[in-house]
C-alpha cells in the first residue's frame, strides 16, 4: 500500500490528572489533524467527569477508551492520592490497558505507536512488552525535566537530601545545565528527607524513562527553552518541541475542544466585561493546590488592600475545612468561581496580572496572553517553573512560600502599577511574540510538528495478534 493510503493509529495515555489530561488531549487533537486514527485512554472515573463538561467533543477518527483506576467508585477523594493512584494503575490495570492496545476492530487499523505520559510508567511498559513503538510526552517544563533528571547526581554529590536546617535559597551545583540557577526550594523533592521516599523514587524513575521512547515530545518552544533543550537533547536526541500546544492547535485547526474535568463558570466573563482594561487580578491555584483557611484569608485581605478588582477560582476542596457561602459572595471588587475558562479569562483586556500556582499549562497560557504573573507554587514542577519565569525569563515575581496580607498587597501593586511591573509586562509581551511566531507556519513548533508526523508515518505497524498474556 502506498504511504499516502496507509492508515496510522496513535494511542495516547496520560496520567489521570487535569494538567496531564489537558496537555495530552491537545496533542491528540493536533495528531488528528494529520488524518491519524486516535485512541485516547481515560480512567473510567475521569471519563465520566469529562462527559459532563465536554458533551460537544466530536472529532473524526477519534475515540475514547476507558480502564478502571483500581479504586472503588464511591471513594470520595478527589483528586485521588498521587502515589496510591500510580501503584493502583500499575498493579491492577495492566491487563485492561493491554486489551486496548491489542483489540481487533475491523474499522480501525492496528496501533502504529503509543504516546505515553512520562509520569505514568504503565503507559510505556505495556506497549514495550508488545513491541509497539513508544514516544514519550513530558507535559511539564524543560527546566523541570533537568532538575528531576539530576536527582541521582545530587544524591551522589551529597547535595540531597537537604539538611534539617538547610538554607532553602542556597543554589545547587549538581543540576545539569542549570548550575547557579536552581535553589534548594525549587526542587520537587525539597520536602523529603529520605532517598527511599516513594515520591523521590517515582521522580527518579520517571526521568530515567525519558530516553526509552523513540522520541520525546515537549510542550515548549525552541526560543523559550534553548538553555535547557541543549542538555535535554544530550539525553534524548530526538526531541520535538511543539509548544504551546493550544496555540499550535489554534493555528492548524482554528478550533479546539476543552479537556476540563470541571464545569467552567462563564459568568465571570460578563463580570470582566464591566471592568476597565488591566484592572483585574486573576487568581487560580490549579486543580490540586490546597491551602489553610488562614492562608485564604491572608490572600483575600491582601487582594482587597491592593485596591484592585480580583477574579478568584476557588475549588470546593481547595480551602481546608471549606468556606461558608457568604464568604464567597461576589461584589463590585471581587468575583469567585469554582472553575474558569482560563484561556479566555487571560485573553480578556480587563486582566492585568495572574496570581498563579505556576503549573506549566497555566504558565504557557499566561505567556501567550502577555499577562505578567505572581507565583505561589505548591509542589512538583511548579517550583522550578516559578524560578524560571521570575529569574531566567523575568516575566513574573516569585512569592516563595510567603502569603501574608501585606506581602500579597505589595506584590499585586508592584505588578499592576509599579516600575517592576512595567518591566515584567514588556518582557512577557516580547516572549508572547516569540511564542506566537514559533507556532506559525515556518516557525519552530510548526516545523517540528510536521517532522513528528513524518516520524510517526515512518514507523512500521507492529504485529499485535498475540493476546495470550491477557
UniProtKB/Swiss-Prot annotation:
Record-annotated membrane-spanning stretches: none
EC number: 2.4.1.-
Tissue: Expressed in young cromes.
PROSITE patterns: UDPGT
Presence of the UniProt keyword Glycosyltransferase in the record: yes
Keywords assigned: Glycosyltransferase, Transferase
Keyword Cytoplasm in annotation: no
Described purpose of this protein according to its UniProt entry: Glucosyltransferase involved in montbretin A (MbA) biosynthesis. Catalyzes the glucosylation of myricetin 3-O-alpha-L-rhamnoside (MR) to produce myricetin 3-O-[beta-D-glucosyl-(1->2)-alpha-L-rhamnoside] (MRG), a precursor of MbA. MbA is a potent inhibitor of human pancreatic alpha-amylase and is being developed as drug candidate to treat type-2 diabetes. In vitro, is able to transfer UDP-xylose with 50-fold less efficiency compared with UDP-glucose.
Family per record: Belongs to the UDP-glycosyltransferase family.
Protein name: Myricetin 3-O-rhamnoside 1,2-glucosyltransferase UGT709G2
Species of origin: Crocosmia x crocosmiiflora (Montbretia)
Gene: UGT709G2
